[in-house]
Amino acid sequence: MFVYVNTPLVVMIWQNYDDNLFIRLGQYLASGHWLGPYSQFTLMKGPGYPAFLAANYWSGLPITFTQGLFCCLALAALSLVTFRATRSRLVALAIFVVPLLDPRVFEVSRVLRDCIYFSQSILIIAVVSYCLFLSNGIRTRLISAIIAGALFGWFWLTREEGVWLLPAITVLGLFALLRKKRYSEACKILPPALIGTGAFVLVLVLFATINFFIYGMFIGVDFKERNFQAALSAMESVQIAKPIPYVNVPRAARAQIYAISPHFAELRPYLDPNPGPSPWEAGDCLHRPTACGDIGNGFFIWAVRDAAAKVGVYKSPKDASRFYKAISKEIRSACTKRQLRCVKNFVPYMPRMTRSQIEQIPRSAIELLRDMVHPGMYSKFADGHVTGPKDEFRSALDFLNYPLHYPISNSHFTAVAIRGWYHDPKIGDQWFSVTVSDKGDKALPFTLIRIASPDLVESQHDENATQQRFSLRTQCGAGCVLHFASADGGTRDVAISSSTALTAQYLPIGSGLLVFDSGAVENEATVYDDGRVRLASRIRAVLYPIFEILLPVLLGLGTLSFFGGCYMAVRKRNYPIILAVAAACWVSVLTRSVILVLIDVSSFPAMITPYLLPIYVLSVVASILSLSVMRKRWTFVDQTGTATQTSDTSCVDG
């Protein structure tokens, strides 16, 4: 918790499709205005994380503390299940502590849904396991089923690819059936399964129902809306002579679609402006060279939505749905009439791949495996990228309850106050001019006051030097410089560093003399000066080499132990709870890995920490559980919690 809370947050308020979107939706929820006025952004992504942000705002706790606490609670729940199943305090403690020490958990220091997504997956596996294996009595079992279903509904509305956790839940159900000796006992699993499913469906129906009353359409996340997906599928089905990797709807295909689809042609000024390139063309170019000069798969969906919003499509969900339905219908009709050459894509939600992309699957899988085993070295986030309007930045910080954060790049955290005098005997009482600048602004505001100077009349023997003293005050940020200019064209720049550098300074400017009698530079304390942040950074730096050694051993032995445990379980027909939970975790790792590899080779780079976090944590948990299964002497625990020792290598039975 200390490291999590004291890892500064990077508040990217310019990220309208991620960080700022979640903050804005959360602010609407917290103020009681649902998800706000309808636009292309309103239902673009699920409200799971904005709801968490809203709840955090009401709690008054910094968002980093709440997210860290949620991670601890999820691991504590799984640790409790582990203890109930094994009666081993050591294994339960390892389940709680080792994932928390994984330095990769702290890498996502942004306002992203991925910060809670891995915790949600752990908590769901823990609650489902408790419901199926450890709950005593019908009432407890049904309540835990409702909680599990509601959690899965929340999980489903947090990211769009929640299907990857379904196989893990199925595995837990299969183990529960295998552990039942009689048909009548197996039937007892059905009621909680149905109730949990009902709670899951109820969450989704409730979300769509509220959208119906607020926005006029029974709809969930409109990214998955039927007509929107049909339109995308229709666009991607249009073929050109030579397919371009990572560009399923290239400019040549768009030109053909414009010709036969009046509705899609409305988007042409924004997708393919004339003259000039589309602003979306640069998005995929850095990582996908074949996409340079065109709109790559990773950005095409957002480009279409953005263009549709600019032509007024997103007045309501119904208007947007009708628009995309018309595009789909026009393209399908042209395909049927052979006006377009089309090939149907039979894999929903996944762009079509060329042969060269398919050949990249092994490379992507190896990269994922390498990232799992080797955490790399500690690298500080590029905090200098925090930019945006200051009022929005302050509003976001207030909503997030002021966590430790990197300051905005154009923050004025240096206060400068100078007192002195200026005299030029050649020009009498004429005055100098001054401007103030820093890295973010070339013309900062300042206050310059002329003060009576009878002492200078006498000391300089100039009867015109009656108002030559001054007081100068300003605020600036990094790279602060004072630019002085005299009436005769002389200039002098003074870089602000410390009060000492401004005191008793004599600066010739042209034919005049500028004197600083005293100067004060007060730097507002920032995250860079916080000892807690420096300590947390050192702890993270120490953890990376430790896990660089630990992970290959832990994951390697964990994998072998899992297969050994499965072999023993099948041979003895004894299916312990701990093996069931380990299997669920390993299956989750596998299914999410498959999804990320397919995304990586078909669309945008997916081997990044935010997407990989569930794999990182679940693989560590699965390895620890698998190792506990293969102990020399197995603890045999019955449903009542009584533990006995066996002389052979039997499996743990909860």
For each feature predicted by the language model, list its residue ranges.
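Juxtamembrane membrane-water interface segments immediately following transmembrane helices
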Residues: 9-23, 196, 200-377
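Basic, ligand-binding patches in group-transfer machinery
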Residues: 412-525
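Transmembrane-helix motifs of polytopic, lipid-linked glycan transferases
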Residues: 62-87, 123-127
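Extracytoplasmic catalytic/substrate-binding loops of multi-pass membrane glycan-assembly enzymes
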Residues: 8-25, 34-52
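Transmembrane-helix signature of polytopic, membrane-embedded enzymes
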Residues: 76-103, 119, 138-143
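Aromatic- and kink-enriched transmembrane "portal" helix at the membrane-lumen/periplasm boundary
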Residues: 6, 47-54, 60-64, 96-119, ...
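Membrane-interface alpha helices of multi-pass inner-membrane proteins
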Residues: 144-159, 200-202, 207
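Membrane-interface anchor segments at the N-terminal boundary of transmembrane helices
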Residues: 59-66, 329, 334-415, 519-585
